[in-house]
Amino acid sequence: MRKQNLIEMEGIVTESLPNAMFRVCLDNGCQVLAHISGKIRKNYIRILLGDRVKVELSPYDLTKGRITYRLRTRSPS
């Protein structure tokens, strides 16, 4: 699939499922089922509950997506 056709959104991980699958609540309130992209898996980046992530969605099926980036959390100061 070409990169232009993907929809990129941000959300929060609400549930961890088997086989590196996660349930993500997007900023617009929708729930999607997302798996980890290959680069995140290759670099051993851990994704935990409550993490903010970027998710790519296909315009053909808006219920499934791919986690492409884990956003940094700001430390309270």
From Swiss-Prot:
The keyword Transmembrane does not apply. Pfam families: eIF-1a. It is found in: Plastid, Chloroplast. The keyword Methyltransferase does not apply. GO terms for molecular function: ribosome binding; rRNA binding; translation initiation factor activity. GO terms for cellular component: chloroplast; cytosol. Residues 1-72 form the S1-like domain. HAMAP family: IF_1. Component of the 30S ribosomal translation pre-initiation complex which assembles on the 30S ribosome in the order IF-2 and IF-3, IF-1 and N-formylmethionyl-tRNA(fMet); mRNA recruitment can occur at any time during PIC assembly. One of the essential components for the initiation of protein synthesis. Stabilizes the binding of IF-2 and IF-3 on the 30S subunit to which N-formylmethionyl-tRNA(fMet) subsequently binds. Helps modulate mRNA selection, yielding the 30S pre-initiation complex (PIC). Upon addition of the 50S ribosomal subunit IF-1, IF-2 and IF-3 are released leaving the mature 70S translation initiation complex. NCBIfam families: infA. Belongs to the IF-1 family. This is Translation initiation factor IF-1, chloroplastic. It comes from Staurastrum punctulatum (Green alga).
